[in-house]
Amino acid sequence: MIGGICPTCGLPKELCICEEVAKEQQRINVKVNKRRYGKEVTVIEGLDPTDIDLEDLSKFMKGKLACGGTVKGNSIELQGNHRDRVKELLSLKGYSTENIS
């Protein structure tokens, strides 16, 4: 097979829906923290790194928001206050808006 088999569900990679199911079930918390010198940082928590590639999601967010950021542990940190836009972008990526707070 070209794509291989998903280790979670056992289906071929082309038919695997594990990531979509994981997106619907996660409770995501978006908050803004103040750092040194009054700088604001948007923190996205509650993402499971085993089901979703946080680096790819972080890269997508940084590109759309035109800001810097990083992945720390199970969270994504973005420079600046982007709380409202992050919720919109997460819904575009397939996350349920009811599970984003």
Swiss-Prot record:
GO terms for biological process, alphabetical: formation of translation preinitiation complex; regulation of translation; translation reinitiation
Domain of life: Archaea
Alphabetized UniProt keyword annotations: Protein biosynthesis, Translation regulation
A Pfam family matched in the record: SUI1
InterPro entries documented for this protein: DENR/SUI1_TIF (IPR050318), SUI1 (IPR001950), SUI1_arc (IPR022851), SUI1_arc_bac (IPR005872), SUI1_dom_sf (IPR036877)
Signal sequence region: none
Entry similarity comment: Belongs to the SUI1 family.
NCBIfam families noted in UniProt: PRK00939.1, SUI1_rel
Protein name as annotated: Protein translation factor SUI1 homolog
Species this chain originates from: Methanoregula boonei (strain DSM 21154 / JCM 14090 / 6A8)
Taxonomic path: Archaea, Methanobacteriati, Methanobacteriota, Stenosarchaea group, Methanomicrobia
